[in-house]
Amino acid sequence: GAALQQLADAGLDDFYRGDVAREIAADLERIGAPVTRTDLERYHARLVAPLMLKLPGLSVANLPPPTQGLASLLILGIFERLGEARLDSFEHHHGLIEATKRAFAIRDRYITDPAELDHPPADFLSDAALMREAAAIDRKRAAKLPLRNGDGDTIWMGAIDGNGLAVSYIQSIYWEYGSGCVLPATGIHWQNRGVSFSLDRNAANPLLPGRKPFHTLTPALAR
């Protein structure tokens, strides 16, 4: 409660550069975590242009890397080009599942820290690229999963009011107990998003100083 009250009184920037940041850094040092107060002070939110996908009758926006917004747009774009409009048919479900597999394969290979991207994300959303992915789908046979099938328990909520003000909210600490690290001074429970890093320096998301981890956020907006 005290940490939340301090943030309410001093402003949210106190989390990174104020008294709350000081308490966080001290607790992290005590438990041997490598995150320092300097790391907290260097953090800045980035205002970026969204990725856009045009579909019949609407446009869909989502965030670029390091989130998986690209993957959600790929699923929609590939599936739309399959032309399977009959809801709840075998073709509909099969097409959606296979489009997801194709999108996840691209996600796992290319999405990384935006400063380290090899390909502009928007290139994957071109009509030619989406048609190529759709054409690679077998309409009758399931492809092998491109990734290990794990558990999932993240929740997402969205709300929009009569004035068009929208909120996209996701609650996730990645694993059941996140990092398992609760800081005693503030009561803050730290999530475990860093698990998406790899100790292989040649991997798409290597654990290196200053790198941003891959994140599963997908705050979509359709218009």
Regions found by a protein language model. Name each.
Residues 1-61, 65:
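Long, well-ordered, tryptophan-enriched scaffold segments
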Residues 3-10, 23-31, 43-46, 74-82, ...:
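Generic, well-ordered alpha-helical scaffold segments in large soluble proteins
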Residues 10-15, 30, 61-69, 85-93, ...:
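Hydrophobic alpha-helical scaffolding
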Residues 35, 165-223:
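Active-site rim segments in enzyme catalytic domains, especially the processed small/beta chain
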Residues 47, 151-154, 215-217:
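Short, small/polar residue-rich loop motifs at catalytic or cofactor-binding pockets
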Residues 61-69, 155-158, 168-182:
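Glycine-rich phosphate/pyrophosphate-binding beta-alpha loops
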Residues 83-172, 185-186, 193:
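Internal maturation/activation junctions in enzymes
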